[in-house]
């Protein structure tokens, strides 16, 4: 699996040119991508990056990548991120690492979003992986009940015996809805709930997925079909 992540990372690095301003998401495949960019930076590649998580930022700095503040005016050339699940149409389920809100902000600030993954992340329908939902800690039990009224089973994410705390000082509910037949409708309903900050459904955001398999690298766009 680590070899596939390296393959996807190296393929994605070919998109990065000298002088670019890019977005960096989070997760193990993105971390490998950052390491590849760090190797290129040592060879003279000059780029600037906005990081979606503190872990990504720390790794990027350690690898010699110049981190900049979130852009206020101009768009980033491209953002790179991972995914927990990728369904046809490049519908994504993300947030296993707990950085979904910042990942979505960085993706929205870029001209295009490229997803890095191995073939295990390709699915026919989203939902085998529980849907992360970032929530306000105050009154979280009521928020969980509202989500469960929509048909899900919500579990508070823990770190040891304490709630997991996001970089935004919020909490995460991992919500089991089974197969998500209509991601657009579910995202809209959950996002409307009082106490919900953001969902891990990334819809109509990615323009391409770079997927590594034992047979090589596959470049998947929104209209492409793929075998799961």
From Swiss-Prot:
Entry's Gene Ontology molecular function annotations: ribose-5-phosphate isomerase activity
GO cellular component: cytosol
E.C. code: 5.3.1.6
Entry keyword annotation includes Methyltransferase: no
Catalysed reaction, written as an equation: aldehydo-D-ribose 5-phosphate = D-ribulose 5-phosphate
CDD domains in the record: RPI_A
Sorted UniProt keywords: Isomerase
Statement: the UniProt record of this protein carries the keyword Acyltransferase: no
Family label: Belongs to the ribose 5-phosphate isomerase family.
Role, per record: Catalyzes the reversible conversion of ribose-5-phosphate to ribulose 5-phosphate.
Self-association state and partner proteins as the record states: Homodimer.
HAMAP family in alphabetical order: Rib_5P_isom_A
PANTHER family for this protein: RIBOSE-5-PHOSPHATE ISOMERASE
Protein's recorded name: Ribose-5-phosphate isomerase A
Organism: Shouchella clausii (strain KSM-K16) (Alkalihalobacillus clausii)
């Amino acid at each position: 699996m680590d070899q596939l992540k390296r393959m996807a990372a190296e393929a994605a690095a070919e998109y990065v040119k000298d002088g670019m301003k890019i977005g960096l998401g989070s997760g193990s495949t993105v971390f490998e991508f950052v390491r590849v960019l760090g190797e290129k930076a040592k060879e003279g590649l000059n780029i600037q990056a906005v990081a979606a998580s503190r872990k990504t930022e720390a790794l990027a700095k350690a690898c010699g990548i110049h981190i900049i503040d979130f852009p206020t005016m101009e768009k980033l050339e491209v953002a790179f991120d991972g995914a927990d699940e990728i369904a046809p149409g490049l519908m994504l389920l993300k947030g296993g690492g707990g950085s979904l809100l910042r990942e979505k902000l960085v993706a929205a600030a870029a001209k295009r979003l490229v997803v890095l993954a191995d073939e295990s992340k390709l699915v026919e329908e989203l939902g085998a992986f529980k849907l992360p939902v970032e929530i306000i800690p105050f009154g979280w039990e009521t928020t969980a009940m509202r989500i469960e009224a929509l048909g899900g089973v919500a579990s508070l994410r823990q770190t040891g015996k304490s709630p997991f705390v996001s970089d935004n000082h919020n909490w995460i509910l991992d919500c089991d809805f089974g197969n998500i037949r209509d991601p657009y409708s579910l995202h809209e309903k959950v996002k409307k709930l009082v106490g919900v900050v953001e969902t891990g459904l990334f819809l109509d955001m990615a323009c391409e997925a770079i997927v590594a398999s034992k047979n090589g690298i596959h470049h998947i766009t929104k209209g492409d079909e793929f075998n799961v």
